[in-house]
Amino acid sequence: MSAAQGWDRNRRRGGGAAGGASGVSGAGAAGGGRGTGQLNRFVQLSGRPHLPGKKKIRWDPVRRRFIQSCPIIRIPNRFLRGHRPPPARSGHRCVADNTNLYVFGGYNPDYDESGGPDNEDYPLFRELWRYHFATGVWHQMGTDGYMPRELASMSLVLHGNNLLVFGGTGIPFGESNGNDVHVCNVKYKRWALLSCRGKRPSRIYGQAMALINGSLYVFGGTTGYIYSTDLHKLDLNTMVWTQLKPNNLSCDLPEERYRHEIAHDGQRIYILGGGTSWTAYSLNKIHAYNLETNAWEEIATKPHEKIGFPAARRCHSCVQIKNDVFICGGYNGEVILGDIWKLNLQTFQWVKLPATMPEPVYFHCAAVTPAGCMYIHGGVVNIHENKRTGSLFKIWLVVPSLLELAWEKLLAAFPNLANLSRTQLLHLGLTQELIERLK
């Protein structure tokens, strides 16, 4: 069967992995238009921060600004100095630590945008990028070992210095799926394949994955033809896969789906949204898997006063800060969404944030730093033109600590701080933790 035939059959039967021409009628297209709604204001960073005058900084007004407006900050390409930024893409994944945003994989059918003859894996991106927060520099990481070829709608989590990648699909979508766990140590820049035993998941993409108490949990996904409601667990100590069999009747299980997201509180795994090529699931009620009772539960959430519930969606992003879960963007089957919502896992109360994404997207990726700053990258921004973006945005989801506010002011005042030696930085009074953020 030719690749073209594979794509055609996938349009009819399965879900797209990264948003494509099939997305209007299939699962995972990405949609169009630019949102004009905004918070109080969007802040666009200049090419290089200027050196401010010696003016005393008053922190209280700065903190109030974050509380009231939750500003979304666009990081334009001209600020990403030193290296070219990643080409526009969709279906990729990202994670973040205190120092870097790591972006893996992705898809773009536009030959020129995806690198033309220089991209041997067109229309996919077999590459790992790092965005350094302190300097605003993108860097394509050179790595050793075998980098996986399933580069769209895979799952990605960060475990210490290791990126854990599971599943995903190559081209044609649904014909070259994976079910291996690949590990990349970002410190030593080396890939390895985990040798696992037991009942592993099918070869799928669009599944959701979480790291809980030393185990990976994988739920849902699609083969490209069949959607799944299976739940698997990989114990990272024994490297044994187990297919969990919940104590429920089949009618009480969550609907089969892909491109959903999951959150957890250590006791339950919560399924947020997702869908199939013909539907997107509601967020009014969510399913939760109880790790202690081995059973699925259905939880009714509470609507935002005067606004109601968030729209049903798939292909959105989700990050978590303690018991607060934030979802943004996505596609509801008709339009691309640009809203941001918060769900508290103790009260199950939905709150709509006052921010609106400058570019409504789906099939994008998002990650949150330990300090509470979310970064959003890429995605599809126009359904009819099948257009992707390479934009990078950030938004503080919590009030930044005094340390974080001072750190951002310091970086703005001294943009070449990263060029100083460790000894010089210590003499300036920087802590070891902050020095590590510069390297």
From Swiss-Prot:
Subcellular localization: Nucleus; Cytoplasm
Xref: Gene3D superfamilies: Kelch-type beta propeller
One GO biological process term: protein ubiquitination
Chain residue ranges for the region called Interaction with CUL2: 398-439
Start-end of each Kelch repeat: 87-154, 155-198, 199-260, 261-319, 320-364, 365-403
Pfam families reported in the protein's UniProt record: Kelch_4, Kelch_KLHDC2_KLHL20_DRC7
GO molecular function: ubiquitin-like ligase-substrate adaptor activity
Pathway: Protein modification; protein ubiquitination
Keywords: Cytoplasm, Kelch repeat, Methylation, Nucleus, Repeat, Ubl conjugation pathway
InterPro entries tied to this protein: Kelch-typ_b-propeller, Kelch_1, KLHDC10
Cystine crosslinks: none
Phenotype reported upon loss of the gene: No visible phenotype in normal conditions. Mice are protected against TNF-alpha-induced systemic inflammation: they show a reduction in the inflammatory response, but not in early systemic necroptosis.
Keyword flag Zinc-finger: no
Tagged with keyword Cytoplasm: yes
Composition bias, Gly residues: 15-36
Sequence positions bearing Omega-N-methylarginine: R13
Classification via SUPFAM superfamilies: Kelch motif (SSF117281), NHL repeat (SSF101898)
UniProt region (Disordered), positions on chain: 1-50
Cellular component terms per the entry's GO annotation: Cul2-RING ubiquitin ligase complex; cytoplasm; nucleoplasm
Function (record text): Substrate-recognition component of a Cul2-RING (CRL2) E3 ubiquitin-protein ligase complex of the DesCEND (destruction via C-end degrons) pathway, which recognizes a C-degron located at the extreme C-terminus of target proteins, leading to their ubiquitination and degradation. The C-degron recognized by the DesCEND pathway is usually a motif of less than ten residues and can be present in full-length proteins, truncated proteins or proteolytically cleaved forms.
Entry's family note: Belongs to the KLHDC10 family.
PANTHER family: KELCH DOMAIN-CONTAINING PROTEIN 10 (PTHR46428:SF1)
Subunit structure: Component of a CRL2 E3 ubiquitin-protein ligase complex, also named ECS (Elongin BC-CUL2/5-SOCS-box protein) complex, composed of CUL2, Elongin BC (ELOB and ELOC), RBX1 and substrate-specific adapter KLHDC10. Interacts (via the 6 Kelch repeats) with PPP5C.
Protein name from the UniProt record: Kelch domain-containing protein 10
Taxonomic source organism: Mus musculus (Mouse)
Gene: Klhdc10
